[in-house]
Design a protein with these regions (language model features):
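RNase H-like DDE/DDD metal-dependent nuclease/strand-transfer catalytic core used by mobile genetic elements
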Residues: 149-170, 176-292, 405-412, 418
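DNA-binding alpha-helical recognition surfaces that contact promoter or target DNA
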Residues: 43, 104, 117, 121
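Residues that mark the N-terminal boundary/hinge immediately upstream of a DNA-recognition element
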Residues: 25-26, 98
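Short, basic alpha-helical nucleic acid-contact segments in DNA-binding proteins
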Residues: 48-52, 112-113, 121-134
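C-terminal, beta-rich DNA-binding module of retroviral/retroelements integrases
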Residues: 305-418
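Short, basic alpha-helical/linker "hinge" immediately adjacent to a nucleic-acid-recognition surface
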Residues: 2-7, 27-82
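Structured nucleic-acid-interacting core domains from mobile-element enzymes and related host factors
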Residues: 138-151
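A short, amphipathic alpha-helix used for macromolecular contacts
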Residues: 63-115, 156-161
């Protein structure tokens, strides 16, 4: 209901109060006509009785309303226009305006302080407003009580920097309890090795978590009927172990799979804030190179981890994470190399088995390697660690012993899927 002074003139109000005082109309009917409560009614009645001649309900503004400058107005509309173009681009995974981002951008870039309701008001007036779709419930929730109880790991393939005209992969790892982002990197190609490097970075820095939570991507899980068209299906789901999964098995870390897109949605929602700002900043910065985009990502990652209060936990992720570690509310364990292995290169690596021929050689596709201390007929387990872009270190294990170490050009390892 609108304000009293907008619905009644002072004279109309005087008449109603005067009739009440003369017992011509009961209070409850007067209140209903005016649309006010008992307390407000008696406040007005007292004011009328104290000064009937000068009684008024007309609102008098004591100071001019706050307004924004034309330049600020122009910048708001400029930023809203950029967002509109982003939303209209079907290649970009953004479907709504982010008024909070625009508020932050006005403050940081233009040094203009504007309230969020003001930005939303201008958006509605100038056609930069979309109704939010109703959220659908997902069929699984992951609830954790400890840091390291569950690490949400994901990869998203999108046009993060539209000016580059190239889609990149964003690989991320996030602690479910604290919402602290442990790892984030942009890559042009997604490989098993890229995900293994993510494991190595997180585990060596923070320790071994209790479990990882991922989708059923072929890098994380072999699924019958999907991952090999020529396969005769003698193997069922999970009877073939992907490289990434073998690393976690060596580390004694459990894996939990999201069995539906709805369940996986819980993984993706915490990343939404980071992804949203990454795209909007790359658009405004005309970012074309992946190295430049990574710098933008690092900046937004720091802001997310150390400055932003998370909407779910109502805490800054870094502070919540550190408090959990300090108070021993953590399931992270110290990483140690599993015997008989000697180096992290034996754990965070690609693996394959070969049989040593009578000439103490093995073959990797068309590449033949002669091994030292090899026994013909024995099986050798190759642990391949890409040391650089050009060279990989192959560590050869047989019967629990490291029998040889060789360095090979990656171009010679054709057929090995990094």
């Amino acid at each position: 209901m609108s304000q009293l002074h907008k619905r009644f003139t002072s004279e109309q109000l005087k008449e109603l109060l005067d009739r009440y005082l003369k017992n011509e109309i009961e209070r409850k009917y007067t209140q209903e006509i005016l649309g006010i409560r008992k307390r407000r009614f008696f406040v007005l009645l007292k004011q009328y009785k104290d000064n009937p001649q000068h009684f008024t309900v007309q609102y008098r503004r004591t100071r001019a309303p706050r307004t924004i400058s034309p330049m600020t107005e122009q910048n708001i509309l400029k930023e809203l226009s950029i967002d509109k173009k982003i939303i209209q681009n079907k290649e970009i995974p953004l479907k709504s305006y982010n008024y909070s981002y625009i508020k932050d951008r006005l403050r940081v870039t233009y040094h203009q302080k504007v309230s969020l309701p003001t930005i939303i008001d201008r958006a509605k007036k100038h056609g930069f407003y979309l109704k939010k779709p109703k959220r659908t419930l997902h069929d699984r929730e992951v609830l954790t009580r400890y840091a390291g109880e569950l690490i949400q790991h994901d990869a998203s393939h999108h046009l993060w920097a539209p000016a580059s005209q190239e889609k990149w992969y964003l690989i991320t790892s996030l602690d479910d309890y604290s919402r602290f982002m442990l790892y984030a990197i942009l890559l042009k190609t997604e490989t098993s090795w890229a995900h293994i490097l993510a494991l190595q970075t997180v585990i060596l820095r923070y320790g071994l978590p209790y479990a990882y939570y991922v989708d059923s991507h072929s890098i994380f899980r072999f699924v019958r009927g999907r991952d090999s068209l020529w396969y005769k299906h003698h193997l069922l789901t999970d009877e073939t172990t992907p490289q990434w999964k073998q690393v976690l098995q060596d580390c004694n870390v459990k894996i939990t799979y999201a069995l539906s897109p709805q369940a996986k949605g819980k993984i993706e929602r915490p990343y939404g804030w980071l992804q949203d700002r990454l795209i909007r900043t790359c658009v405004r910065g005309d970012v074309k190179e992946i190295k430049h985009a990574q710098r933008v990502l690092n900046h937004e990652l720091y802001r997310y981890n150390h400055q932003q209060v998370h909407s779910t936990t109502q805490e800054i992720p870094y502070l919540r994470f550190q408090r959990a570690l300090t108070e021993r509310q953590s399931l992270f364990r110290e990483f140690t190399i599993k015997p008989p292995y000697q180096s992290v290169k034996d754990i965070f690596c690609l693996r394959m088995d070969r049989t040593i021929d009578p000439y103490r050689r093995i073959s990797i596709n068309n590449l033949q390697l002669k091994l030292n201390h090899a026994s013909p007929g024995k099986t050798v387990n190759l642990r391949i660690y890409p040391s650089t872009i050009e060279v990989s270190e192959i560590r050869c294990w047989s019967e629990g012993k490291l029998i040889d170490v060789q360095r090979i050009k990656n171009t010679d390892l054709k057929g090995v899927h990094f």
